[in-house]
Amino acid sequence: MTNIRKTHPLMKIVNSSFIDLPAPSNISSWWNFGSLLGICLIAQILTGLFLAMHYTSDTMTAFSSVTHICRDVNYGWLIRYLHANGASMFFICLFLHVGRGLYYGSYMYLETWNIGVLLLFAVMATAFMGYVLPWGQMSFWGATVITNLLSAIPYIGTNLVEWIWGGFSVDKATLTRFFAFHFILPFIVAALAGVHLLFLHETGSNNPSGLNSDTDKIPFHPYYTIKDILGALIMISTLSSLVLFSPDMLGDPDNYIPANPLNTPPHIKPEWYFLFAYAILRSIPNKLGGVLALVLSILILMIIPLLHTAKQRSMMFRPMSQCMFWILVADLFTLTWIGGQPVEYPFVVIGQLASVFYFLIILFIMPVTSMIENQLLKW
């Protein structure tokens, strides 16, 4: 008798994706982040669902309802902080996952990579709208500043912003629709993640060497299930420590002040995971130029497969490219730091240099480095 997991219509999909899936024998812990992102998404949907049971998306009561969740709901504080810090863990895993893809040349799987970039955009949109919901000072002013950027679009900009706001300023209509979108988007993200996996399983996983691994495959279960569980335990421990010891470490104290349209906070800044893009936005003195740079800073990931000039797929055997990659990582850390600083000398200049360098490394320096390495292979 054939095993039920190989014959049952639903079970065989699970079987071919998570049990009998042929996986390269040499994939390192950098390949754990896909499963960690899945765990993050499930955790965010579940905690978000329980928060939505007690939250009210009305400007008069939103802030109070979040306070009520933290004070009066059983373990409401835990659910709220798991959700808020879970978003930070989500982005840490996302950035590491994308970084792994860049380093090991996983972007050569075009469909998987492009859907991944779409996923990144969708998660960023979800996180932005979620930040608005508590209706604190930073929620309100963050929403005002970021949505206002759309007014830079020629001709239709102003109408577009007022259409998104549902009025002439960020108000009740804006909060209600942001709540609706924040609720539905994670399910769209989950569906996209399914398509992401579908395309990945068409080709099979890449591996650190970047070479074809068809001759040396092992089943996903038990080898990588146990490895993923270890990764999950480490992530859950980190998240638990963050939530239970310093839940507000990554948040902004201004968000504990109820939204006041008559009082602007001294420094408007988004959550830490958007600071690199915010720094790029601020480094261009022109509004439309800034918005374009902001979008392109993420959209540039789409054209990375076109910029691959190396003869080897992975950076594992390309020391010069490795140096450029780590300089890019350092540049992103610099941008993140600058995004959280006030707009004054020397931060403005550092931000402008780091922004130029970011695009220069990706568009010019890395492809040229790869070409030089190709020549060195002949020696």
From Swiss-Prot:
This is Cytochrome b. Belongs to the cytochrome b family. CDD domains: cytochrome_b_C, Cytochrome_b_N. Pfam families: Cytochrom_B_C, Cytochrome_B. PANTHER family: CYTOCHROME B. Binds 2 heme b groups non-covalently. It is found in: Mitochondrion inner membrane. The gene is MT-CYB. GO terms for cellular component: mitochondrial inner membrane; respiratory chain complex III.
